[in-house]
Amino acid sequence: MKKLSVLIGTVAALAMPFTANAQSFSGNANGSAGEANLEQSINVTCDVTFDGTVTSSTTVAISSPDIAPGDFSCLFVVPQGTWSAATVSGDATKIDITMGANTVANDPCYGTVRGDWDNSAKVLTITNKTLPPIDPNGATCTIHSATISIPNLNLS
């Protein structure tokens, strides 16, 4: 009888719904702006702006990314590839950003980096992350620091 009670208790526990630990975007990424310090052949600090649409609860399609002069050399740095953002399962303080840039050295980098998200301040911070070169013989790009305000995006 004791084994039957344990078995029934186990079955009842397994039948209970599990709480999903999925993170979810809402709002949009329109009006996002900040600056990024990027290094490949030289170190530059550029202004970054973009808009974006939440395309699913876990993805933001970033549109109209723009890299503008903070430093004069930023005139030669342009966005590369399709940019997007994705939730990190189980962690509402992290966002994966897929992005790229063609650099001053004309050696583009593109990839995904993980940033820290402050949902109260609506700020994404990226520190000391690398983007791989598109050309296998190219040089990596290092994002020493980036701080981007995304005022209309929520992550819960």
Please report, for each region that a protein language model flagged, where it lies by residue.
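A charged, solvent-exposed segment within the mature domains of Sec-exported extracytoplasmic proteins
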Residues: 111-156
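Compositionally biased, low-complexity repeat tracts
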Residues: 5, 23, 27-30, 77, ...
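N-terminal segment immediately downstream of the Sec signal-peptide cleavage site
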Residues: 18-69, 80, 139-156
